[in-house]
């Protein structure tokens, strides 16, 4: 009887998979196309669609050498915004994807800061969750596009 009980406990433990978790601190640069309605005096509505490449300070992190595609928008009032929202897809080196929703605030033409929530993914990251902080500093580049340095840090579990 003890052997059977031990076998049941052993099989239960050996089939139990522990969730993996980690931290990340990724940075990179990107560009995005803009649609804008300018009402003057620093009042403007903007939507954007852009891409960026990221490297993590920890080589081998799931976000290291990833790219992200983001679609979002914001409304400037007297040159400031506090309503930026959007969604990003991260294309990971292993071929999988991770999705986030984000919110932010900042100053038009300069950049902003915000928070994000990891909402899911594909494959082994299907049930990924997490959250973090992001910042963006606008930089000069090709006319007609917006360009920025991006930084994202946070934690995840899958």
Describe the predicted segments one by one:
Residues 4-13:
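Sec-dependent N-terminal signal peptides
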Residues 13-19:
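Sec/Tat signal peptide C-region and signal peptidase I cleavage site
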Residues 19-158:
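Beta-strand-enriched cores of mature, soluble protein domains
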